[in-house]
């Protein structure tokens, strides 16, 4: 797939900027806080309808403006698609494909696929379980767009069940309350779908990431990735998962009443990353942790390509400076011209002459993009 054009209006610090991509590799050069990352964020939003910066829509809309618009033209093996995403300071998003508004956002997902790799991704190793869940969910949305709807359903039931538990906590009702049993059943049904899909996705991703990690580390380290669902998963069969889920809910009924919140379910899952059987967050240097994240990202690229049958876009946000020369070379050698790649950097010294000669170089300054570094 190839992103031909991108048009940003009132998005972040872009007033009205159109970009035409003329090479498989585009290097965006500029000082910090000029808008390089914002452009990559716009592409990420078109791919996943999510921002890895966890920004709210109103934060994405330029000050004094009611809405922001991201338009793109994408070329795939199946033909050319025009994508449009409107973000409102107050109100719902609107998505359109080839000029036609879509009622369901999940029908927009899967048209553009992209893997984002930024310096923030070290949090995959060092951060909380929520960071790893969000990463896995974002990947799943691209592998199986209906997952966005499944996850939304689960989160909605979870919020409503939590509100009901809070209500029980403040009243004389007991955990035997019949309305709670209804929420339990809905939580189990929707949560089981989340658990099974997360389990399947990691089962496919883990061996790819392990192989990349072995290659990058020179076979000196062994990476293991395991899904540790909050609900005990003996078999990935709907009936068994639902039974285990319901059983654990019943076991935790009293603590849930006491705390007024749901203590069982995929919102408490963990993805465990270990290197040489030691938890990765406790293991070694930042360089080794970067190797792990690089392996995960290369595995994401590979898995998405296997599933959608086309190479996804790769968005590299200021990561080359974070990698040592050998890891830089591993990444750049893997990319070549196979993946359309957008790279942000503050200087061009990280790239050799061959890369520079085969890349489109754009200069970014205060939300304006030019082919020369003297924007007026």
From Swiss-Prot:
Gene3D superfamilies: P-loop containing nucleotide triphosphate hydrolases, RecF/RecN/SMC, N-terminal domain. This is DNA replication and repair protein RecF. One of its GO terms (molecular function) is ATP binding. Belongs to the RecF family. CDD domains: ABC_RecF. PANTHER family: DNA REPLICATION AND REPAIR PROTEIN RECF. The keyword Cytoplasm applies. PROSITE patterns: RECF_1, RECF_2. Keywords: ATP-binding, Cytoplasm, DNA damage, DNA repair, DNA replication, DNA-binding, Nucleotide-binding, SOS response. GO terms for cellular component: cytoplasm. Pfam families: SMC_N. ATP binds at residues 30-37. GO terms for biological process: DNA replication; DNA synthesis involved in DNA repair; double-strand break repair; SOS response. Transmembrane segments: none annotated. InterPro entries: DNA-binding_RecF, DNA-binding_RecF_CS, P-loop_NTPase, RecF/RecN/SMC_N, RecF_2. It is found in: Cytoplasm. The keyword ATP-binding applies. The RecF protein is involved in DNA metabolism; it is required for DNA replication and normal SOS inducibility. RecF binds preferentially to single-stranded, linear DNA. It also seems to bind ATP.
């Amino acid at each position: 797939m190839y992103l031909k054009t991108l048009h940003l209006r009132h998005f972040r610090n872009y007033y009205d900027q159109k970009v035409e991509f003329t090479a498989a590799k585009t290097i965006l050069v500029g000082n910090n806080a000029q808008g390089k990352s914002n452009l990559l964020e716009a592409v990420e939003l078109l791919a996943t309808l999510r921002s890895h910066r966890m920004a709210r829509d109103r934060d994405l809309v330029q000050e004094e403006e009611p809405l922001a618009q991201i338009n793109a033209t994408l070329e795939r093996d199946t033909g050319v698609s025009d994508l449009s995403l409107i973000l409102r300071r107050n109100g719902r998003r609107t998505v359109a494909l080839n000029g036609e508004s879509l009622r369901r956002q999940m029908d927009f997902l899967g048209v553009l696929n992209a893997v984002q790799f930024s310096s923030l991704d070290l949090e995959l190793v060092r951060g909380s379980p929520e960071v790893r869940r969000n990463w896995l969910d974002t990947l799943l949305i691209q592998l199986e767009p209906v997952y966005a709807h499944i996850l939304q359903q689960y989160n909605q039931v979870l919020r409503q069940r939590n509100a009901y538990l809070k209500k029980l906590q403040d009243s004389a009702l007991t955990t035997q309350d019949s309305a709670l049993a209804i929420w339990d059943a809905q939580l189990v049904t929707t949560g089981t779908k989340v658990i099974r899909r997360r389990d399947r996705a990691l089962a496919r991703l883990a061996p790819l990431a392990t192989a990349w990690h072995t290659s990058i580390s020179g076979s000196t380290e062994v990476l293991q990735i395991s899904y540790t669902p909050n609900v005990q998963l003996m078999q990935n069969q709907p009936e068994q998962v639902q039974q285990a889920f319901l059983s654990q809910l019943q076991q935790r009924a009293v603590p849930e009443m006491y705390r007024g919140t749901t203590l069982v379910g995929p919102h408490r899952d963990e993805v465990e990353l270990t290197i040489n059987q030691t938890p990765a967050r406790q293991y070694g240097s930042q360089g080794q942790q970067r190797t792990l994240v690089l392996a995960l990202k290369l595995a994401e690229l590979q898995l998405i390509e296997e599933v959608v049958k086309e190479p996804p876009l790769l968005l590299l946000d200021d990561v080359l400076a974070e990698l040592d020369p050998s890891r830089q070379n591993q990444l750049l050698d893997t990319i070549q011209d196979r993946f359309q790649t957008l790279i942000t950097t503050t200087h061009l010294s990280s790239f050799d002459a061959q890369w520079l000669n085969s890349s489109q170089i754009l200069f970014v300054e205060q939300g304006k993009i030019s082919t020369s570094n003297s924007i007026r």
